[in-house]
Amino acid sequence: MLSIDVSHAVSFLSLPYEAALRPRLERAAGWLQNGGGKGSDFIGWVTLPRDYDRGEYARILAAAKKIQGDSKALVVIGIGGSYLGARGVIECLCSPNYNLKKKSTPNIYFIGNGLSSDALREVTELIGDDDFSVNVISKSGTTTEPAVAFRFFREKLEKKYGKEEAAKRIYATTDAHKGALKSLADQEGYEEFVVPDNIGGRYSVLTAVGLLPIAVAGVDLDELMGGAQEMMSLCSKNDYSNPAWQYAAMRHELYRQGKKAELLACFEPAFRFMAEWWKQLYGESEGKEEKGLFPASVDFTADLHSMGQYIQQGERMLMETVVRFAPAEQQMVVPFDEANGDGLNFLAGKTMDFINRQAMDGTLLAHVEGGVPNIILNLDENNARTMGQLIYFFEYACGLSGYLLGVNPFDQPGVEAYKKNMFALLGKPGYEEMGEELRKRLR
């Protein structure tokens, strides 16, 4: 079970905080569990691990099995919360090199998360003539990046299989009742899965948004959802035995005492895209009204050779949260080298996991001594159950954190600014006057 250790952060606080924060945490927890807080129309994720739609869940498993049987590749089209969680889980549990490994499941390509011509062309070339399917994920169907990518891959499918057969290879995860993608899916007969109205994109990993690609990769969804339900039960406790309470409280107090950025660190490279998901989760949920810790991530030990200098001796505005996994089942042992030219024979016979753990502990002590508070998240294993626990833990703590800040943890009004400018510069109907003004400013 996930556990939290705040002992390397509490010494940075000038006053005890638990008793003072308790009433505010109780209120925040009440808003998450019962509604009444800002954005309460979007708290469906809170009970999702218990109350998910069993019928749709069965259809997800059936669709995943079909894709595994008729496709060598699945193209997942989505941006932000529509793909980061799924990619994070797949890479963490199945490997960042998933597509290069020998396996019985299809390759999975994530696209529609940017506007790069090179990225789009590369995925098209990698698929080549292989049989493939598409999972397009968009609540509205009009978000620029995924909508443009879907045009390309829908055309490729229809040219390869014909319109009728192509429709059997397109899976639309979208709004249950409205929107451009919903209308197209109804018209063309695509199999449809639902983006729930009461769950925002960054909180949607455990809905069809994340579950279909994750299932195609061969991850055990029962274990994933089981882990999330275990953490849901633990997070329902309104006291400091709840790890989400501890995490939200410590982050909030460190923020109040001047910390401005939080680094999420892990000593396993496979965790990279889980950290990308975490960055969106906390960045969009807290970063408003000129408030919030800036979420960043580092891959250790690699980034100790790039960002390590700043973390150790740069401006003292950082805090760190470190995710630690239990030792790997398959151990790599350092061989003995008779020449010992590198002077590393003192490591011979030791496992890489042992060496990595000494690096973790050494880094922890150095950073804390250097003025960087550390929160440790310990996971028993790197498997589907613990991943479900971690996802729910981060989501619940994020909701608490947003309410402690006094912001709405479930909206993201700031992301519209760039979109309006982009539409104006692209000549979208209705934006002509704005486009002229922006072009003048760019001269």
Where do the language-model regions lie?
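Glycine-rich phosphate-binding loops that contact phosphosugars or nucleotide phosphates
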Residues: 65-238, 424
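Short, solvent-exposed amphipathic alpha-helical segments in soluble enzyme
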Residues: 91-94, 125-127, 151-153, 186-188, ...
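C-terminal helical cap and adjacent loop that interface with cofactors, partners, or active-site loops
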Residues: 363-426
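Short, charged beta->alpha transition segments
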Residues: 62, 117-125, 248-251, 324, ...
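Active-site phosphate/pyrophosphate-binding segments
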Residues: 161-321, 326-329, 412-443
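Extended, charge-enriched "interface" segments that sit outside catalytic cores
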Residues: 1-68, 336-342, 346, 434-443
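Helicase-primase coupling helices
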Residues: 296-383
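Glycine-rich phosphate/diphosphate-binding loops that line cofactor/substrate pockets in enzymes
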Residues: 59-72, 123-131, 250-260, 311-316
